[in-house]
Each structure stands twice: as C-alpha cells, then as structure tokens.
C-alpha cells in the first residue's frame, strides 16, 4: 500500500455484466473483518474495469491482510482474493521496475550484453531452455536460438517482502512458429530475488522455467517416442498393463496415446483449440492420474 493509500485494481470482464463492486479487508485467517466498502467510482472500457480502492488507516505496519474483491453479476457473486501489506521502505515498486526491465532486456539482442554484470560462474546446463539461472551462459539467459515473442504481457506477483530483499515472480506466454509452420506456445515463469540499495540493484537469484503447451500435431510422434517439446523431465504418466496405451499430463491437460492404433487424443483440457486464454491457461490447473485399464479407460482427478 502506497503513501496515498489508494490501491489500483483492474478486472477483465470477458463480456460479463457487473452490477455492483465491493471489497473487504480481513485478517489473514479471514476471521476478523477490518473494513468493508462499496466501490461507487470506477470506469469500464473495452472489457476492462479500472478502480482505485481507498485503504483505511486501520492496518498494522508490516502485517499481511486478506483483501476480498466482490463483483455482483445478476444473481451470481464473483470473488477475487489477494494479500495486502503496509510496509515502509520496502522498495517493491522499484524492484518490480527492475524485474520488468531485466525481462525486456533478455528479448533485446542489442542490449542483452548489459546483463553480464548479474551473471555468475557458468555451471548450468546450456543445452536446454527449460530451466535457466544466472549460472547459465548469457546467451542462454537471452533465449539462445529461440526467436520467440511474448504473447502476453508479463504479470508480476510479489511473493515476499523483507527488509533485505523482495521476491517477485513473472508469468507470461511466449510463442513462435515451429518447423512445421504451426504456432507453438510456452508458459514461462521467472523467479527474481532482488535487493534495492541507493546506488544499484542486486539480483540475488534468477530462475526461469519454460513449459510447452502440447498441441498434439502430426509430428508429435516419432518412432516409439512422444515428442513433448521443452518441458521438465518429471512427466506425470501411466501405462496400461500391456504397455499399449499411455496417458500423460502436460501443462494442465490430459492426453492418451494408443500405440497399436497410432492415435493421440486429448482427454481433458480447459483450453480451447485457438490461441491462449488467461482463464483457460490458469497455472493452478492440475490433473492426477489414478488408473488406466487395459481398454485404455482413464480414472483421474
């Protein structure tokens, strides 16, 4: 919360009519109501609602609180939850600006060399873009031979605020055209641990993970292998007893491959077939495979 005690909030409506907006501030366990109010002043433009929430002078400094934003749409209530904190001299805004600039620079081949001051001893694996840290080469941090573009604007999330450093995570989607001429999409998460001083910013830690959103195109099968693209080595999968049918999870989607029929099928997904939607591509979507029988029927949660 800044000195003006106004919290800017933007909501994507996705063509949902909003009749009323209100908010609550509660203790982190949600048991104690600190403040609540209706939002009467807001603007709506091109499917975006923008508002500023006045935060009353009722918060204890350096204590986290639960903020609940409530939208009324007809007979439905829509809730958004986040945490807020009033902290002096935390320099969160400056750290977010630094993180955004660092991210921008990794995509700019002419400026990428300026990041060398933050690099550490090169001991990381420079053969993959799936996991990149400051221990990789500068070339790897600046995306090596991957000439993709950011499909979505990186969204910063403040995970930790301490007297000595702040932790900020960026989430976004990159895309490029693969060798088969089809668009490929990748979820990217960047973890930054940053220290602010009056003279410079210190990047204490940087980790980037990259996971391909599997599309199941014709070239996804090669011999006895399913080519999942750039992703971690830890694959959630099961096979039936004969090993002829395998089911696996990739970025919140469940897939099944029948080796005898040489068919690959998407069993369950929140995503559509065109583009990437923020709601469908929500990072907390997950699937756990329970069982697969000999006929290829899958139990999952």
Positions of PLM-derived features:
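A short, surface-exposed beta-strand/turn
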Residues: 181-205
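Surface-exposed, charged secondary-structure patches
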Residues: 3-8, 20-48, 52-69, 137-182, ...
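Short, solvent-exposed aromatic-acidic interface loops
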Residues: 85, 205-215
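Core segments of small alpha/beta cavity-forming domains
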Residues: 3-23, 33, 64-149, 222-263, ...
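Short, surface-exposed charged micro-motifs
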Residues: 157-158, 191-193, 236, 245-246
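A short, polar/proline- and glycine-enriched secondary-structure boundary/capping micro-motif
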Residues: 46, 179-182, 212-219, 258-259, ...
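Structural recognition of the beta-propeller blade-terminating site
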Residues: 27, 195, 258-260
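Short, well-ordered strand-loop elements centered on a beta-strand within folded domains, enriched
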Residues: 167-171, 199-209
